[in-house]
Amino acid sequence: MITRRFLCGCIPLVAASAITSRAFGANAECAVYTHDRQRALSSDKAIGLLKEGNERFASGRTVNCDLLAQAKETSTAQAPFAAIVGCMDSRVPPELVFDQKIGDVFSVRIAGNFAEKNIIGSLEFATKVTGVRAIVVLGHNSCGAIRGAIDDVQLGNLTATLANIRPAVASTLYEGDRSAGNSAFVQAVAEENVRRTVALLTQKSEINAALVEAGELRIVGAMHDLATGRVTFLL
């Protein structure tokens, strides 16, 4: 017969077991990346870690780590496993979207997540010097920079910035309303911009191209949904 006392005694044990299990998982997720740990990762595994992190973020199961402890551990060296080329939009912080911590990823952000020589040069440092295993070009829906490029906005230095996105506007295959007021067209251009950026990261970089050819680096594109938090990787 199961008594009230037995149940009351077991419940704390079950709860403690669950907490211990979560703590063990958190400890694994919170371990900082060393060069040995980074080099042991395949490029596919690096992408997989980002997918797993986004699943945690989108399902409300992010891992809580001691960030100050991580800052101290990484103060003398860094060995991130991936680099994210993202938009400067305040709603798309890559480290949070992929549930990564201090020292896990390089984050390169600019309005419209495009690639030009300074961004590509920064990524060559990440890939060749530091050894990241993957680059993700991360776009998002309802992007203001994409809308600005579609509308051919002229505004100070922003004009030159948006000029980097306009080729994606021109190359987007879309029949119908090609204005910034059409969210479907904006989404289509955003995805085309991501794909073009992915291509440019090897077309304009012999270093990245060689690493991809050697199987040491993967470069992929993805789109973030502002409402759900989910990231969809593009084929």
Task: Locate the predicted segments by residue.
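Gly/Ser/Thr-rich loops at beta-strand to alpha-helix junctions
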Residues: 90-91, 140-145
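N-terminal signal peptide c-region/cleavage motif recognized by signal peptidases
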Residues: 20-23
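Divalent-metal-activated hydrolytic enzyme cores
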Residues: 8-10, 28-77, 103, 112-133, ...
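N-terminal secretory signal peptides and thylakoid transit peptides that target proteins
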Residues: 1-14
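Active-site cofactor/substrate anionic-group-binding motifs, chiefly glycine-
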Residues: 88-91, 95-113, 118
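Short beta-strand segments
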Residues: 85-87, 109, 136-140, 220-224
